[in-house]
Amino acid sequence: MKKNWFCNILLTLIVSCSLFIQVAEASPNAAFAKPQQRVDIGGRKLHLYCSGTGNTTVVFDAPGSHGGWAWFKVQPEVAKHTRACVYDRAGFGFSDPAPRPNTSENAVEDLHKALQVAGINPPYLLVGNSLGGGNAQVYAYRYPEQVKGLVLVEPQTEDETERLNKITEGKIKQFDAMWKEVNAYCLGEAIKGFKKGSKALANCVGNQVTLYGPVLGKAVASIMMKPTYWQTRVDESNAFNSSDEQLRALRKPFGDLPLLVLTRGVNENAIPGKPQSAMNKAAEDENEKIHKEIASLSTKGKQRVIPGASHIIQFERPAAVVQAVLEVLKLIE
């Protein structure tokens, strides 16, 4: 979820989710650390990275505040079976910023144009985590003839904020406000220029080498030091409500579209060795209920809990995500 209060609050606000620190391993794939294919979509360029061959192209959309590097543990494995593409939304990674709101509809339009220009033809199997999961649903509604399957990893949905905010007695919206404050703070520091060894650098950028390994980590850190990156985070978070409303306006059954929804099996706010609070348990139950509702929108929909994984499942249990993608791919082909 885009406003997942179950993460450790401080680290969540700084580097998106504390679980990255605990579970990320060094990436053996330096391809994610540099531009691969920058496609002109009308005066600005969107970055794509594809590898593998096959009749169906798997397209990955990252969680909020991330570029395609979020899939560095999954994309190479899927590419052993078919063509697999990651992309950077406008303003992230190696993509140019957009002179318009960073909503789901606009992200989908950008991706659609980029795939066309790059000659990456359908059918597509879309895979999205968190905000990327919301975008994948919007794409499937806008271009149903192109999308032959969906794998939604802890996906954003149009009413999750209100439902979980009610259960958590306002904590979701409190987190949203803190998230925006931190983004604004880091944007200001990026504009001034991060200084080596500074508290601002540690708080806003962190140790990406620990997260992604020496090559990719250095590249991600370099991107996170740019004002463009933080401005895009500000813009994207400001557009969350609009993106929710766009998905709400499109919402309808998916028919018989192969669909697999992956749900976290770990409550990130639970203290190891201590009983889970009633509020945490209620929120986890509601999160799973929301995902089951999404899966029920397709006659070929399934929902699966991934034990040991939290919100960013592709970091903690990448094999489970790869397995899900290959299962849906088999149904398509």
Spans of features found by a protein language model:
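Bacterial N-terminal signal peptides
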Residues: 9-18
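N-terminal cap/lid segment of alpha/beta-hydrolase-fold proteins
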Residues: 28-45
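Conserved HGGG/HGGXW glycine-rich cap/lid loop of the alpha/beta-hydrolase fold
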Residues: 41-94
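Active-site loop/oxyanion-hole signature of alpha/beta-hydrolase fold enzymes
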Residues: 51, 89-127, 143
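Alpha/beta-hydrolase
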Residues: 60-62, 87-89, 153, 263, ...
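Conserved hydrolase catalytic core segment
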Residues: 121-167
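Flexible "cap/lid" subdomain of the alpha/beta-hydrolase fold that forms the substrate-access gate
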Residues: 151-293, 301
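Catalytic active-site module of serine/aspartate enzymes centered on a nucleophile-bearing elbow/loop
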Residues: 297-333
